[in-house]
């Protein structure tokens, strides 16, 4: 029986949480879009990757509920709504409405909000979300092109977009242990609160959360809480959980479409060392020119014989992105580039590329969501944000990287386990 079913609001975020589940002993499969078949064999957890972070609210609710229906048919014991550790949801955002819809469908009147990921500097204290010791609203997320985060107080953010009151379980309570945390949650529920933000400053806080929430029908948060829950659920060793998803050998390509500040730095550095082509948005807009353009880019990638993987980049600076959106329309440009990456990935797979390093969960995420790849057995994590995996039934190993994470040299140089993905050689096991 399926223990945990995750409904993730973007592609790379889905892989993030899947890697945390695997690293803590739960064999995990990630599935692109709402599944139609039965549960894959040999897994304790399934992560369904949607693209609902920034779509219209009703569409986000529709897709999330469809994913929930499938999970319930598989006998899923716990549902986990996964969003980013930087929350990425304004007053007009989707986290609140999707959470409310899931609560109704699961007939539960109370749930938690736990975006913290301390290993990556995302902590919550007194209900305030911090990014590398800076308040969320004072970080680079304040200028996010799609979901600018101008408030750091999670209860206020949640109440602005959801249908109830939101309380806080402070770090001091978590420090007191499982019993104190469980009692504090019970008090909030009795007082009529619908949601509780959980502070988390360290891994121990996440472990306590996992023990307290082991039997909750619905939890919501980032990847950090998954660590605590997996340690409660896991009956397998980490090596067994990892084994199905070790990356394949063969040629690699980098597809970058995130426009975050961090990805801009990473792309700028990597292009100094590896062959790079920038995406021309104008050539992506119509289906006729897009197909021809995807073929031309594929031929260029396949013709490269460099030691490091060639890169196709749609990453743009804030100023350049604004100009593109003004000229072509934000939605139109985004969808056009996403369609290009999907065509390109399919063509590259046909051409023998087996490893895809994907930066960002939107546009490039389409690259790993091409029609030949329906899901992934998740393998060992490359970093606390980023994982490798194998895709059944199509041969391929994606390594998604969330756009806003890791230093400017993520792509190169990198530790041996990651760098192997960028070399056209056999990755280590």
Model segments located where?
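General beta-strand structural signal in soluble alpha/beta enzymes
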Residues: 6-8, 29-31, 79-83, 111-115, ...
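Acidic, glycine-rich loop-and-beta core segments that form the ion-binding/anion-interacting portion
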Residues: 214-281
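C-terminal structural cap/anchor segments
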Residues: 300-359
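Cap/lid and interdomain-hinge subdomains that line or gate substrate/regulatory clefts
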Residues: 1-3, 60, 68-206
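Residue-level detector of conserved catalytic or cofactor/ligand-binding positions
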Residues: 419-429
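Short acidic, glycine/serine/threonine-rich loops at helix termini
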Residues: 17-19, 91-95, 122-130, 180, ...
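Conserved, well-ordered active-site substructure
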Residues: 353-354, 362-404, 410-411
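N-terminal basic/disordered segments at the start of proteins
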Residues: 2-44, 60-64, 114-119
């Amino acid at each position: 029986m399926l223990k945990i079913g995750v409904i993730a609001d973007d592609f790379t975020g889905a892989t993030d949480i899947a890697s945390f589940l695997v690293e803590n002993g739960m064999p995990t499969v990630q599935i692109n879009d709402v599944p139609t078949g039965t549960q894959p064999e040999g897994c304790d957890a399934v992560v369904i990757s949607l693209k609902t972070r920034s779509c219209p609210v009703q569409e986000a609710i529709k897709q999330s509920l469809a994913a929930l229906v499938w999970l319930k048919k598989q006998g899923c014991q716990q549902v986990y709504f996964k969003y980013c550790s930087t929350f990425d949801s304004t007053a007009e955002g989707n986290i609140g409405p999707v959470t409310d819809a899931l609560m109704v469908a699961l007939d539960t009147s109370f749930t938690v909000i736990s975006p913290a990921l301390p290993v990556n500097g995302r902590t919550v204290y007194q209900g305030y979300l911090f990014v590398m010791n800076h308040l969320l609203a004072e970080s680079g997320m304040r200028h996010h092109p799609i979901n600018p985060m101008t408030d750091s107080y999670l209860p206020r953010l949640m109440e602005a977009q959801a249908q109830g009151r939101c309380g806080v379980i402070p770090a001091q309570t978590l420090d007191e242990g499982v019993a104190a945390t469980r009692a504090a949650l019970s008090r909030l529920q009795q007082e009529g609160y619908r949601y509780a933000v959980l502070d988390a400053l360290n891994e121990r806080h996440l472990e306590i959360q996992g023990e307290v929430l082991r039997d909750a029908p619905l939890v919501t948060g980032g990847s950090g809480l998954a660590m605590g829950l997996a340690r409660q659920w896991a009956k397998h060793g980490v090596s067994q959980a990892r084994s199905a998803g070790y990356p394949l050998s063969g040629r690699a390509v980098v597809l970058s479409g995130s426009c975050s500040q961090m990805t801009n730095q990473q792309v700028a550095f990597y292009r100094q060392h590896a062959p790079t082509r920038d995406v021309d948005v104008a050539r992506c807009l119509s289906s006729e020119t897009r197909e021809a353009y995807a073929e031309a880019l594929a031929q260029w990638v396949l013709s490269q014989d460099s030691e490091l993987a060639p890169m196709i980049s749609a990453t743009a600076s804030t100023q350049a992105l604004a100009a593109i959106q003004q000229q072509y329309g934000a939605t139109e440009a985004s969808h056009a580039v996403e369609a290009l990456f999907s065509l390109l990935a399919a063509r590259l797979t046909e051409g023998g590329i087996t490893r895809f390093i994907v930066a960002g969960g939107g546009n490039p995420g389409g690259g790993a969501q091409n029609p030949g790849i329906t899901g992934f057995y998740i393998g060992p994590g490359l970093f606390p944000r980023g994982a490798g995996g194998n895709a059944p039934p199509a041969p391929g190993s994606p390594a998604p990287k969330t756009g806003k994470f890791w230093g400017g040299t993520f792509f190169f140089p990198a530790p041996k386990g990651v760098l192997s993905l960028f070399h056209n050689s056999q990755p280590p096991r």
